[in-house]
Structure formats: structure tokens, C-alpha cells
Amino acid sequence: MDKLIIKGGKKLTGDVSVSGSKNAALPVFISTILAPGLNEIRNVPFLRDINTTIKVLESLGAVVEGNGNIVKIDTTHVNDVEATYDLVKTMRASVLVLGPLLARHGRARVSLPGGCAIGARPINLHLKGLAALGADIRLEHGYVEAKAKKLKGARINFDIATVGGTEQLMMAAALAKGETILENAAREPEIIDLADILNRMGARIDGAGTDTIRIIGVKELAPVVHDVMPDRIEAGTFMVAAAITGGDIKIHNMKLEHLDALVFKLQDAGVEIINRDNVVRVKGPRRPRAINIKTRPYPGFPTDMQAQFMALMCVADGASVISENIFENRFMHVSELLRFGADITIEGNTATVKGVKKLSGAPVMATDLRASASLILAGLAADNTTEISRIYHLDRGYDSIEKKLAGLGADIKRVKE
């Protein structure tokens, strides 16, 4: 098992390029089930979750070949309709194969999902939506079993905005008979990216990126070439890395408009952000100001940046209040940040962070994907040496982050435990 060793206290400088988005790539890969033939996906990040998705697709009959950041997926012979527990248990997004398999073959059997242990993230909204499209849904021995002779369009109003549920039903409705309206749909940029590939396959989807999405079903979809959007959470993590080290970096291949809420809060904290010719320059202050945040669905402050922003607030001037409104149990990084000398108290879904002048390096343990990033950020800012174990979480969502940070001047290396 690997661990990271960080010698902190170095200001980050230089240029870094953002990889393709994990959260966009996973549904994009799965959407190829709907378009039998050879699909080519470009700007693909090297991640454990990508490898898991490839294994799921191969288990269903797809032939997948990778060459650098380009992955070719031939879904001509996707004839198996079962995604087993062994594959699905490690990654929640695997459940997204349910809708495409149902739309293409009229049946699917998919294990209930796994992934990061950050609270109960039920798929009931996925199942409720598929049932509204005419599917017969049953839960049997930890599996979702779904059948439908032909999915039919429907008006579906989500109880809460759900990214996975919106993606699931967009894909299923693409081949349904008639019109489907998704109300209170998720608005994330990754939804737009999925709609983009589906529309180029021949789907008829309008309104992606708004809370109302209209899908007119078509008889068939055709394979395409698609470039995955840049990873906004990776970009945001680098922005905080510059801020927490008082650094000065330039970030390439990112879309700043995807991070408006984060940019606003960073600027409030005293971080200078300049966007010129699609290159974003981030200059950290001597010491950030304490700022309150509340996580919200997009376009609000992203829950996937909460842990990283908390690390920044650990060294801020003053006290900040951080409210987590998306997921329960998403403060698992707090106990590890305390090992650095941070001053954090939790009450319910709210953390109060009193900034300290300096953190001290410590042995810590990653608990989930974004918590891993927060510990790296704390280690970059801390005096002395930090060791982070269980970094396999990190490999689920960050492509070579330690190499990219080293390229910015960080003293960070991966070693075997």
C-alpha cells in the first residue's frame, strides 16, 4: 500500500494542467452502451474509478482499448445485462449502467452500489424515475432487477436535485418512446457534458444545465468521438493549493465559469485570481481571511470542495463556519486535520474553524477522496513532515496529483508503506 510524504512550507509556483473530469467521464463511458459500435473518448484521466468503469463495461461485453488519454469503447456486443457486486461495490457510479441496459435490452440486473463512505446516498430517485418510464423494478438479494418491454416518456419531478439520478434518466429516456420532462434536474456542468455526447449520438435533449430537461426519445443512437470536459474539482484543488501556500501558479485546461462559487469565496479570502487567454493565475495571500461557506447544489459551493476549503480556513485569520448541506458524514477529515494542530469543532452539519498561524506536520490517514486532498493541502502548508496513508482513495479521483504538485515545487513523493 502506498503513502505520501510531504515536507511542507514551500510556496507553489509554475504551471499546471488540469486532467479530464472524473465525474463527467464515468457517465460518458457508460453512455456508450446506448450507441452500439466504436466510440472514442478523449481527454480521459488516469484514475482507479475509470479502470473500474472499464471493467464493468468489459463484463457486459464491451471491448475497450486505451492509448494515453484516448479510450476506444466498442459496445457492439454488449449483450450481458448483469453488473455484479464484485465490480459495483467499489464505485457508486456503476449503478448508472441500469438505465442504458434497460433502454437497450429491456432488462438489467445491477448490484446496489458502493464508493466513498460519506453517508447514505440512496438510489431511490433513480429507481422511482425508471419506474415512471414504465420499468418494473424489484430489489432482490442486494440487486436491482429491472424489466421493461419499451420505456415510455414521462414527466418526472425529482424530490431533490440529484446528479446521478438526472444522468440515469437522461440516458434511459434517450431511447424511450415519446417525450420525457425532468423537473428539478441537477444543473452541474457534468450534466451538460453528458447531454453533449448523447446529442451527438443522435439523442434529442434540451435544457441540460437548467432545472428542466426535455428529452424526445429516438429509435437508435450512433457511436461518436467525444472530449471529456476538464475536472473542475481538480482545478479548484490546485487553486486552494496556491492559496494555502501563498503561491503563484497558472492553471491550464480549466473552465473558471464552472467554479464561480469557489472563486467568489477565494477572492473574499484574499486570493487573487486572474483569467487571461484561458489560463487562470492564482496568487495566494500572506494569510487568508476567514470566510463562511455553505455547500449547495450547483451553481452553489460544491460539496466536493468543502474539505479542501476547510484546510485553507485552518490557517486563516479569524473564525469561519462551514455548513455541509449535501451529504451527511462528510466531516471525516476533521479528526485528521486536528492532528496538524487545527482548531475545529463540529455541531451537527456545521464545523467552526478557528484559524491558527501555523500547522505542524503529522502522520494522518485518508478517509475518502476529497478528505485525501484536504490532508495534502494541510501538509503543503505545515511545518515539518507529513505522512498520509490509505491514499488509494486519492487515486479514485486525482490523476497524478503528487507529480503535478511536485512540478509546482512541492516536496512530495509517493512511497510504499
UniProtKB/Swiss-Prot annotation:
NCBIfam families cross-referenced by the UniProt entry: murA, PRK09369.1
Gene giving rise to this polypeptide: murA
Annotated catalytic residues: C116 (proton donor)
EC number, as in UniProt: 2.5.1.7
Catalytic activity, reaction form: phosphoenolpyruvate + UDP-N-acetyl-alpha-D-glucosamine = UDP-N-acetyl-3-O-(1-carboxyvinyl)-alpha-D-glucosamine + phosphate
Record's protein name: UDP-N-acetylglucosamine 1-carboxyvinyltransferase
Signal sequence region: none
Entry keyword set: Cell cycle, Cell division, Cell shape, Cell wall biogenesis/degradation, Cytoplasm, Peptidoglycan synthesis, Pyruvate, Transferase
Protein location: Cytoplasm
Chain residues that bind UDP-N-acetyl-alpha-D-glucosamine: R92, D304, I326
